[in-house]
């Protein structure tokens, strides 16, 4: 199994967040956004859409969260 980037998860598939890389901590406001959105290590979610600009929409506890390409390429997840 192993991990992959959030952007590699197929629409309709579920995942568990494994790691938020340090690189994202240096983006102003991004870490707070991820924490408020429950996109934190150990949390489960499901990819519901991927837009042409690379934004990945995920369902976290019933809430739709749009994750930009920069973050979705770097957040590591595992399939559930």
Feature-to-residue mapping (PLM):
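Glycine- and charge-enriched low-complexity intrinsically disordered segments
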Residues: 69-80
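Mid-protein regulatory/catalytic core that forms ligand/cofactor-binding pockets
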Residues: 1-71
């Amino acid at each position: 199994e192993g991990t992959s980037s959030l952007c590699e998860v197929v629409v309709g598939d579920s995942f568990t967040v494994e790691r938020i890389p340090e690189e994202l901590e240096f983006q102003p406001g991004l870490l707070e956004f991820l924490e408020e959105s429950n996109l934190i290590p150990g949390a489960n979610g499901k990819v519901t859409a991927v837009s042409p600009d690379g934004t990945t929409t995920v369902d976290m506890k019933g809430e739709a969260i749009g994750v930009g390409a920069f973050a979705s390429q770097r957040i590591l997840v595992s399939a559930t």
